[in-house]
Regions:
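Phosphate/dinucleotide-binding and metal-coordinating scaffold of catalytic cores
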Residues: 1-107
Length: 107
């Protein structure tokens, strides 16, 4: 089985823990608490601030990307009919084109 890792700059944030029709959940380990300084990921992906919060350790929260947002990114081209595996492969090719700091890696 392939492992899906999530990175911010050179720091591994976590691994993909679940995929369903609406959300992709990435568990953030406890030692990564300042990686999203100034709400970088929240701003970039429009995440609800309940999931990215300075007041709570990130280990207690999940970072959530909504598939509807992803479908609006031309690089992703994720279709509703795509299987979870197909979505993972497409997501693995995604990068933040503005900063090249956040990316998903398939190992």
């Amino acid at each position: 089985m392939q492992r899906i890792s999530v990175f911010f700059k050179d720091t591994k944030l976590g691994e993909l823990s679940m995929v369903n029709d609406n959300y992709i959940y990435v568990c953030l380990p406890e030692n990564i608490k300042k990686a999203t300084q100034n709400g970088y990921l929240k701003t970039l992906y429009g995440c609800d601030k309940n999931f990215i919060s300075k007041e709570l350790p990130f280990s207690l929260k999940n970072f959530v990307v909504n598939n509807e947002q992803i479908k609006n990114w031309p690089e992703a081209k994720i279709e509703k009919e795509d299987s979870d595996f197909e979505r993972l492969l497409k997501l693995a090719k995604l990068q933040d084109t503005a900063h090249n700091e956040f990316y998903i890696l398939v190992e």
